[in-house]
């Protein structure tokens, strides 16, 4: 005997009803099957609103609407399965809803709904589900036995939330003579009290019914069919990289359920655990999925964690005062009164040294708990033995579940570390009270980030980097291509780079999980989300996981002024944008102070030398105590190319035009030839070395006369540049005559004096052969003399710059 239970989502429409019938048929070929059915999706909730709201004439309209849902359902079944007895089923539906209408008319007369009538109203969906399934199976030539839960399941409790007496119910069902060839059907959610009245079993009542019937029939297995593949390691609506659990123990399932996982209600687990009946969670939308097996305790060698879950809308009561220490029965009185009033206490945290106790409960109970506690301890409060009750609202309890979790090394420390990385404070912790769970209390606003951090730390073997990319010009696109190309390599290194946002100055593409880099451009074009700083900051507010990074591949000054704000939100910053590092010394220092305080990285390797390891090399060098004697460098790839062409006899205007065509220059080459870009890079280096200077402190010897500033149009600028061709040719020839070349060089002296100018250098200089877009940097230091440290390579181009950004990205996790 095997028991199958199908929830409301599995019976949501005609196709799903018939799919359930197919599953029942297939299972019945191997062994006898008992089936427990819920009402079709949303029907029970719909009927519940009838008894929860004011009973008036509008209720009859709602009854008709509910009836029509069932009529449409069986009409669709008839179209798909022609032998289905539509007229007989329709007649049953009409009879049931006519009963409801008579009940409602009676309620309208007495102007109230008796408690005993409420379960009759809200249980119609389950009863009709059984009748519809009976008719489907009989039309397929199957014999069916229907068990009446009112007469066979004895309940204890109130009309709307009863508990089953398993022992008595077992006796009753044992007396029934059921043909072993018959398929057994029973409505879930329903039972009968000792007076024979219909009652319902409260939340998850159908699952509970299934567990009870499985126990009563001595079923060898209880299958709970729903709309998910089984038990996952976390809520997939919140955490993107969850995975299916093959097996969990009864106790683990109980803990998961108790702390909020939508697996099974604890009441459902109790009977299957008591009678050692295995339970399988299966998916009617994916019948091939193996599901999750719930059974006896795990093998002691099983060290795997099983899930992270949460309870929302929690409050924490803080009760303090001298009587907690001096009077031993005060704490007992607190929990006796709460137990007597059926108030659920989720966590208890006691601190005897501070004469206080904290307990967590649901927010909905706050007013009543406050009322009964004040009434109970009126005298103690009046005498000052108890302080006013302090209540902390808007909390969440996160719980990590796993067998013998309290004995596992480093689990608690990993939890705290993952939360600490995002500045999430832990208000309370329960560790050791249950050997299968660790629970922490945090603010509700940190739920999303907290559960993602913990899950990624404990359950995902790969190190995840969440990227928010702003700027998809040449460098941004090259970066995306490089990361896509390296996916296999990164996978081998257990690194997963997830792009959560891709944006330009006009719009953005954002996904809660991860953007597929194979078709990001197509999806970006489809996106209708606008981009501005207000929208960006709102989006970032609730999306920061551990290892979340903002990459700025723009040259936008306003965006660079947001870096401190981004860091405070929990993001690392990687930027090829030089604006922040060349802003005021005050802002430059504030970024670093904030990054240090928030334990975040601010990386900008490509600010100087594109993909060359300049910044990282300098930081490593000077952190070991080395000191600069002097520096000279060619810091512009575009000017390296142009001056190299001048050396070959190419005219200035033609060399500049060729550099622009190859993508070495800014849109208007004046920006390159002005020398300001080289000055900014020199400023970054000087500050990195330790000099507290501003951009205005750098002496720039202009390449061009002042009058060229007015030519903002690139074509006009290049045309006018011809006026300087002969001057530069003469200057180049003069240098060549004595064996020298011209180079545009940035210099830093030991006293911090910085300059940018054209210099004439000979063949002994390390910069002599640097051209064709190369950068070269020569550092004379205490450690590197008389031969300098030289860094040389291409310092311009999208690919090398993107490579530098990519390198910074991997440094986030190193």
UniProtKB/Swiss-Prot annotation:
Keywords, ordered alphabetically: Amino-acid biosynthesis, ATP-binding, Kinase, Lysine biosynthesis, Metal-binding, Methionine biosynthesis, Multifunctional enzyme, NAD, NADP, Nucleotide-binding, Oxidoreductase, Sodium, Threonine biosynthesis, Transferase
Binding site for Na(+): 605, 608, 610, 612
Molecular function, one GO term: metal ion binding
Keyword set includes NADP: yes
Alphabetical list of InterPro entries matching this protein: AceGlu_kinase-like_sf, ACT-like_dom_sf, ACT_Aspartokinase, ACT_dom, AK-HD, AK-HSDH_N, Asp/Glu/Uridylate_kinase, Asp/hSer_DH_NAD-bd
EC number: 2.7.2.4, 1.1.1.3
Region (Homoserine dehydrogenase): 470-814
Pfam families according to UniProt: AA_kinase, ACT_9, Homoserine_dh, NAD_binding_3
An individual GO BP term: lysine biosynthetic process via diaminopimelate
Residues where L-homoserine binds: 666, 677
Superkingdom as given in the UniProt entry: Bacteria
Domain ACT: 319-400
Catalytic activity: L-homoserine + NADP(+) = L-aspartate 4-semialdehyde + NADPH + H(+); L-homoserine + NAD(+) = L-aspartate 4-semialdehyde + NADH + H(+); L-aspartate + ATP = 4-phospho-L-aspartate + ADP
Sequence positions that bind NADP(+): 475, 506, 554, 576, 578, 663, 666, 797
Pathway(s) served: Amino-acid biosynthesis; L-lysine biosynthesis via DAP pathway; (S)-tetrahydrodipicolinate from L-aspartate: step 1/4; Amino-acid biosynthesis; L-methionine biosynthesis via de novo pathway; L-homoserine from L-aspartate: step 1/3; Amino-acid biosynthesis; L-methionine biosynthesis via de novo pathway; L-homoserine from L-aspartate: step 3/3; Amino-acid biosynthesis; L-threonine biosynthesis; L-threonine from L-aspartate: step 1/5
Cofactor: how and how many bound: A sodium ion is seen in the structure; a metal ion may subtly affect the relative position of the nucleotide-binding region to influence enzyme activity, and could increase the stability of the enzyme.
Region (Aspartokinase): 1-248
Functional summary from the UniProt entry: Bifunctional aspartate kinase and homoserine dehydrogenase that catalyzes the first and the third steps toward the synthesis of lysine, methionine and threonine from aspartate.
UniProt family annotation: In the N-terminal section; belongs to the aspartokinase family. In the C-terminal section; belongs to the homoserine dehydrogenase family.
Protein name from the UniProt record: Bifunctional aspartokinase/homoserine dehydrogenase
Gene assigned in the entry: thrA
């Amino acid at each position: 005997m095997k028991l199958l239970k199908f929830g409301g989502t599995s019976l949501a429409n005609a196709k799903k009803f018939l799919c359930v019938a197919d599953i029942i048929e297939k299972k019945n070929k191997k062994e006898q099957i008992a089936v427990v059915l819920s009402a079709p999706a949303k029907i029970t909730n719909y009927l519940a609103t009838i008894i929860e709201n004011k009973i008036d004439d509008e209720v009859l309209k709602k009854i008709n609407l509910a009836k029509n849902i069932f009529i449409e359902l069986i009409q669709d079944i008839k179209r798909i399965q022609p032998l289905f007895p539509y007229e007989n089923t329709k007649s049953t539906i009409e009879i049931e809803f006519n009963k409801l209408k008579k009940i409602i008319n009676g309620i309208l007369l007495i102007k109230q709904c008796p408690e005993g009538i409420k379960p009759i109203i809200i249980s119609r969906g389950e009863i009709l589900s059984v009748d519809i399934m009976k008719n489907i199976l009989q039309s397929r030539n199957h014999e069916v036995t229907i068990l009446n839960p009112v007469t066979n399941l004895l309940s204890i409790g109130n009309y709307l939330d009863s508990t089953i007496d398993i022992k008595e119910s077992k006796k009753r069902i044992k007396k029934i003579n059921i043909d072993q060839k018959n398929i057994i059907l029973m409505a879930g959610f329903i039972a009968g009290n000792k007076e024979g009245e219909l009652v319902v079993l409260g939340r998850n009542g159908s699952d509970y019914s299934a567990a009870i019937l499985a126990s009563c029939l001595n079923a060898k297995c209880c299958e709970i069919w729903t709309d998910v593949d089984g038990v996952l390691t976390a809520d997939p609506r919140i955490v993107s990289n969850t995975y299916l659990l093959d097996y969990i123990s009864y106790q683990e399932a109980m803990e998961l359920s108790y702390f909020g996982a939508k697996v099974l209600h604890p009441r459902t687990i109790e009977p299957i655990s008591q009678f050692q009946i295995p339970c399988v969670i299966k998916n009617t939308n994916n019948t091939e999925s193996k599901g999750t097996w719930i059974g006896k305790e795990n093998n002691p060698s099983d060290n795997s964690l099983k899930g992270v879950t949460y309870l929302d809308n929690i409050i924490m009561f803080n009760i303090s005062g001298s009587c907690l220490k001096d009077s031993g029965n005060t704490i007992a009185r607190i929990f006796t009164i709460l137990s007597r009033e059926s108030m659920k206490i989720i966590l208890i945290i006691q601190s005897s040294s501070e004469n206080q106790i904290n307990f967590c409960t649901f927010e909905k109970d706050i007013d009543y708990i406050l009322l009964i506690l004040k009434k109970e301890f009126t005298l103690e409060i009046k005498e000052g033995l108890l302080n006013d009750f302090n209540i902390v609202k808007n909390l969440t309890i996160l719980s990590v579940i796993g067998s013998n979790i309290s004995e596992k090394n480093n689990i608690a420390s990993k939890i705290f570390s993952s939360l600490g990385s995002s500045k999430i404070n832990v208000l309370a912790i329960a560790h050791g009270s249950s050997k299968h769970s660790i629970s922490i209390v945090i603010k509700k606003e940190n739920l999303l980030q907290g559960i993602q951090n913990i899950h990624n730390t404990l359950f995902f073997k790969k190190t995840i980097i969440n990227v928010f990319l702003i700027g998809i010009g040449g460098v941004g696109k090259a970066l995306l291509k490089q990361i896509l190309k390296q996916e296999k390599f990164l996978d081998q290194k257990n690194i997963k780079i997830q792009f959560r946002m891709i944006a330009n100055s006009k719009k953005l593409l954002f996904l809660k999980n991860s953007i597929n880099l194979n078709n990001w451009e197509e999806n970006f074009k489809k996106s209708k989300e606008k981009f501005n700083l207000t929208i960006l900051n709102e989006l970032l507010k609730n999306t920061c996981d551990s290892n979340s990074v903002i990459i700025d591949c723009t040259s936008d000054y306003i965006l660079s002024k947001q870096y401190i704000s981004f860091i405070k939100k929990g993001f690392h910053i990687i930027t090829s944008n030089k604006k922040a590092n060349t802003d005021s010394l005050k802002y430059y220092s504030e970024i670093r102070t904030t990054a240090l305080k928030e334990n975040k990285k601010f990386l900008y390797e490509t600010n100087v030398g594109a993909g060359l390891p300049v910044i990282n090399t300098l930081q490593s060098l000077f952190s070991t105590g080395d000191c600069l004697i002097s520096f000279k460098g060619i810091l512009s790839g575009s000017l390296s190319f142009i001056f190299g062409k001048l050396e070959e006899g190419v005219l200035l205007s033609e060399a500049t035009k060729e550099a622009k065509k190859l993508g070495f220059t800014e849109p208007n080459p004046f920006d390159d030839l002005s020398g300001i870009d080289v000055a900014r890079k020199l400023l970054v280096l000087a500050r990195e070395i330790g000099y507290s200077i501003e951009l205005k402190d750098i002496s720039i010897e202009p390449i061009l006369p002042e009058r060229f500033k007015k030519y903002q149009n690139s074509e006009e600028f290049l045309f006018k540049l011809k006026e300087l061709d002969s001057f530069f040719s003469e200057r180049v020839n003069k240098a060549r005559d004595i064996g020298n070349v011209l180079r545009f060089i940035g210099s830093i002296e030991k006293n911090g004096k910085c300059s940018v100018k054209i210099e004439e250098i000979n063949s002994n200089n390390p910069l002599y052969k640097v051209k064709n877009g190369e950068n070269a940097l020569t550092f004379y230091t205490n450690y590197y003399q008389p031969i300098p440290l030289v860094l040389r390579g291409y310092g311009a181009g999208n690919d090398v710059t993107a490579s530098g950004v990519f390198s910074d990205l991997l440094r986030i996790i190193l």
